[in-house]
């Protein structure tokens, strides 16, 4: 007999993935160069040469039996030590090897962090708009996701509503900065006030409220902006990171959870997540990727391409009369649709072979997301299609 719970999930397929697959089918019909696919956040720049060199060194200079052997459940020691040292250099916090747990990307990091700090029946708060997989990640723990309504058009967290919704049942808050889908970077003032609220409520309820911070876009910031590090503002923070974007390694699926020094349970959380990983059949990410990435932590891919693409699209959208905020980072724009129904707007956009994602997917209505992690020349070639789309609403 099939598991009806998981069978029921088939009715909730990813709009992003479906749009991406439509783009592939359409490209087969009219040519790849004629389809302007802004659906999927798949990096479009190559990984750093240092990563390639590190892989070559490992494959040619290391003992193959040791290289391809199992690593400890808590992860490769070289990787964990290197990540801790990198975080200390970057953010001035005293992380140690024991605070780092490697995972299969940020998705694995979030899933393990949530399982470690929630119990069935607990509540987890997040801010709209939010990455749609947060729902299954939270529900998979037996907890319940509650969504703080958005604060448009700037989309900084709605802290007034958040404070009202932060009841005694909430054991964890899940944030994402720089944010997918808006590109918003949470300001230092926002994080300071968020930390104050969490501290006040933790004291009032007699238990610490954990902060799980989803940060795969940390290294993609614009206009020389520094991205504030949430763990620097609140001690009970589990930081979830991925190398998919910063090193352009999405297919390698490597990320980590960093347990902030001084966090409640710091001495056991990594061991807990290692056990969770074993018992749910995930285990560690490939050890060779951990070791290669450990030698590349101070470099990134050429991320400047995304700022170039953002400027091209942002300026064109503004010139065409779209309501859109300038993003602080990521590779997403989040303009207001030219009609109330974002799904209908995206269907109209397909008439011009523009593939956009409706904001309903992210928990808000009336907006669309453009993932501009595509070739810059293709961005330029898409601008006339945007003009035609805007003209269709005049």
Located regions from the model:
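N-terminal alpha-helical segment of soluble enzymes
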Residues: 61-63
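Pre-Walker A segment
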Residues: 66-67
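PLP-dependent class I/II
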Residues: 1-16, 27-59, 74, 78, ...
């Amino acid at each position: 007999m099939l598991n009806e719970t998981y069978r029921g999930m088939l009715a909730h397929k990813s709009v992003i993935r479906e749009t991406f697959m439509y783009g592939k089918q359409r490209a087969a019909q009219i040519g790849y160069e004629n389809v302007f696919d802004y659906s999927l956040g798949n990096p479009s720049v190559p990984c750093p040469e240092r990563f390639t060199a590190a892989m070559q060194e490992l494959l040619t200079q290391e003992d193959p039996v040791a290289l391809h052997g199992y690593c400890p459940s808590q992860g490769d020691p070289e990787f964990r030590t290197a990540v801790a040292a990198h975080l200390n250099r970057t953010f001035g916090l005293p992380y140690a090897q024991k605070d780092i747990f490697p995972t299969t990307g940020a998705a694995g990091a979030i899933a393990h962090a949530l399982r470690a700090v929630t119990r069935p029946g607990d509540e987890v708060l997040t801010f709209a708009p939010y990455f749609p997989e947060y729902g299954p990640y939270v529900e998979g723990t037996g907890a319940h996701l509650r969504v703080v309504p958005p604060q448009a058009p700037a989309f900084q967290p709605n802290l007034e509503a958040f404070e009202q919704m932060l009841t005694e049942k909430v054991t964890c808050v899940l944030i994402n900065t720089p944010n997918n889908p808006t590109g918003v970077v949470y300001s230092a003032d926002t994080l300071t006030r968020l930390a104050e609220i969490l501290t006040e409520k933790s004291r009032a309820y007699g238990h610490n409220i954990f902060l799980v911070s989803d940060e795969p876009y940390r290294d993609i910031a614009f206009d020389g902006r520094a991205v504030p590090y949430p763990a620097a503002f609140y001690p009970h923070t589990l930081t979830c990171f991925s190398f998919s974007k910063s090193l352009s390694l999405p297919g390698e699926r490597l990320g980590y959870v960093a347990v902030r020094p001084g966090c409640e349970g710091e001495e056991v959380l990594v061991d807990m997540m290692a056990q969770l990983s074993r018992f749910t059949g995930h285990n560690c990410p490939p050890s060779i990727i951990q070791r290669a990435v450990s030698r590349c932590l101070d470099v990134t891919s050429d991320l400047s391409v995304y700022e170039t693409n953002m400027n091209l699209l942002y300026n064109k959208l503004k010139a065409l009369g779209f309501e859109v905020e300038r993003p602080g980072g990521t590779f997403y724009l989040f303009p207001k649709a030219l009609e109330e129904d974002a799904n209908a707007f995206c269907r109209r956009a397909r008439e011009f072979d523009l593939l956009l994602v409706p904001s309903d997917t992210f928990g808000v209505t009336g907006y669309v997301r453009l993932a501009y992690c595509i070739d810059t020349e293709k961005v330029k070639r898409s601008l006339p299609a945007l003009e035609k789309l805007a003209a269709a609403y005049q």
